[in-house]
Amino acid sequence: MEYGEEPSIKRFLMLPDDLVFNCLARVSRLHYPTLSLVSKKFRFLLASKELYQTRILLGGTESCLYVCVRLHTDSEQLHWFIIYQGPNSSKKVLVPISSPNFTSAALPGFVVVGHEIYAIGGGSENKNASINATGSKTYNALSSVMVMDSRSHTWREAPSMRVARVFPSACTLDGRIYVTGGCENLNSMNWMEIFDTKTQTWEFLQIPSEEVCKGSEYLSISYQRTVYVGSREKDVTYKMHKGKWRGADICLNHGWSLDPSSCCVIENVFYRCSLGDVRWYDLKKREWAALKGLEGLPTFTNYYRNFKSADHCGKLAISWEEYVLVDDETKIWCAEIAIQKRQNGEIWGTLEWFDNVFISSGPNRHVDLLVNALTATVW
């Protein structure tokens, strides 16, 4: 036993291992970050495979909301957090967890497959190169893929992509990861590649038209059991249909092409969050409709920015930044909205909670801290 442990903790750890695991498996994983601070023994137990095997046997699955942040003090390092609510508090906060030991000035593409979070590609700033003709920085693209096991919050390296990609777009469908764009000289052979998470192998998805891949920056999402890809430059969206690409609903394209991480799909309904409101896509009317019933949710003013959304147990989880000019600080807010489909075809939302979960002080006005918000299902 470690020096200074409470007698009650000592007595608990003296129990047979199978009984200890049985007890810990019944505790919500949201409390694990706090429990891991008790002692090294607790940290070992909470990270052990035996604990997760016990949780599987007990049928204990949870969906946890993860937030990735890039701090102004170290803008190339990605920091990962989990949203946590203490046992004696109603306030929710971001609790830091293990972050991968690599830097990326250009953001990777992020996806979730089961209990694993993938960070795909990205790039380091090319400090030896001059600013390009558009006034933008240039980057050294990466082909690497990092994966976090959300059961233990440990990172591993997955097989690299065949092509290095900077600011790639990624989405998942049926356990396969579709990665689009992010490299120079795109053509019908390298425009998109697919990672099979079961076989851990990459393959290119050839497309029939060079016209589709003339852009450089793409956005993608899985919706209606297929993959949608939008091009910023061409202002057009394509969808895959029976192995072929064709133009998608133009109304859909105009609604989501600003930022794919501000959009999510919940029970086959497309939602997006932006300055002003939360909207869902009405397939019958082929238009975006405001999500009604959000009493209590603050009005999104010009000081709110960088919206992210995720499906959290069938509820809409929203994260955003607020810059507070008088204090020269940036706050990260999170909210959770319950969704209700009504008989007349309308969709309403009920705000369950919203909270200021993180504050960063310093010259952040022109720096986006919030990188992404993702939900992973774990045992």
Curated annotation (Swiss-Prot):
**Which regions form coiled coils?**
none
Q: Which UniProt keywords apply?
A: Kelch repeat, Repeat
Q: Where are the Kelch repeats?
A: 116-175, 176-222, 262-308
Cited PROSITE patterns: FBOX
List each copy of the F-box domain by range.
9-55
User: Which superkingdom heads the taxonomic lineage of this protein's source?
Assistant: Eukaryota
**Protein's UniProt name:** F-box/kelch-repeat protein At4g33900
